[in-house]
Amino acid sequence: MDDFPLISMFFLATSVLVGMGIGDTLYFRSLKLVGTVRGLLLSNAYPLFTAMIAVLILHEPLTVGLLLGTTFVIAGVILVLTSGRALVKQQGPAIDKGEHLGMVLALLAALCWAITTSMVKVGAQDVDGLSATAVRLVVAAGALLVVGRLSPVGLQLRQYRGRHLAGTVAAGVITALCSVTFLLAIQFTGAAKTATLTSTAPLFGVPMSLLTGEKLTWQTVMGSIVSVAGIWMVVAG
């Protein structure tokens, strides 16, 4: 870590603040204003924003496979997210200002995540994945500690005992592993492809729905097929 470039540390640390501090805050606020489904759908513009930044600023190649694959993945995820759910229509002739604001916040959250992914790509160029991940996790832990201290209810660490403590530790370990794989994916495949592939997270809920006895809808099946086709295009392209 002694030879860790300061510019890399800056981009990696700032990426956490932009993604978690601003992006996640805007996203959770948008969910309160427009609801879960519409918030998820609008924030799903994240891969498109990332591809634009990656191509225009980071000079990553724009291939037909990436373009078509990203479109297919987003369409498939939208089908999965809307399966079995009805978008609640706003009563009255127009959408109120709160919903307009919520839509804007969801899109801004997606833009923040795109900027975060791009900053990670820049910051991780000249360092190894584990060191880069360590920087991001330390900054994230420090930021959460400060937020917890400033919170009216405080950190409340004493309530984490037994199963709660084990679950929290397990979640932390999984988060660390995911952070490593996410950063390595950006290093080896680029920001645009990584953003597209990581946006398929809702698809992993499909097998879980089978285990819990939920009924599969045609949107879920078609969405999964379309997304898998999109993933193949991105990887092959």
Question: What residue ranges belong to the model's regions?
Answer:
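Alpha-helical transmembrane segments of compact multi-pass small-molecule transporters, enriched
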Residues: 42-56, 71, 139-143, 178, ...
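Membrane-interface interhelical linkers
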Residues: 1-14, 24-34, 75, 82-104, ...
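Hydrophobic residues within alpha-helical transmembrane segments
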Residues: 10, 14, 18, 45, ...
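Juxtamembrane helix-loop boundary signature in multi-pass membrane transporters
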Residues: 48-111, 210, 215-237
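Structural motif at transmembrane-helix junctions in multi-pass transporters
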Residues: 25-42, 125-131, 180-197
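Selected transmembrane alpha-helices and immediately adjacent juxtamembrane segments
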Residues: 98-125, 130, 169
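Juxtamembrane helix-loop-helix junctions in multi-pass membrane proteins
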Residues: 1, 115-142, 190-196
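Residues that mark transmembrane-helix kinks and helix-interface sites
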Residues: 20-28, 51, 74, 81, ...
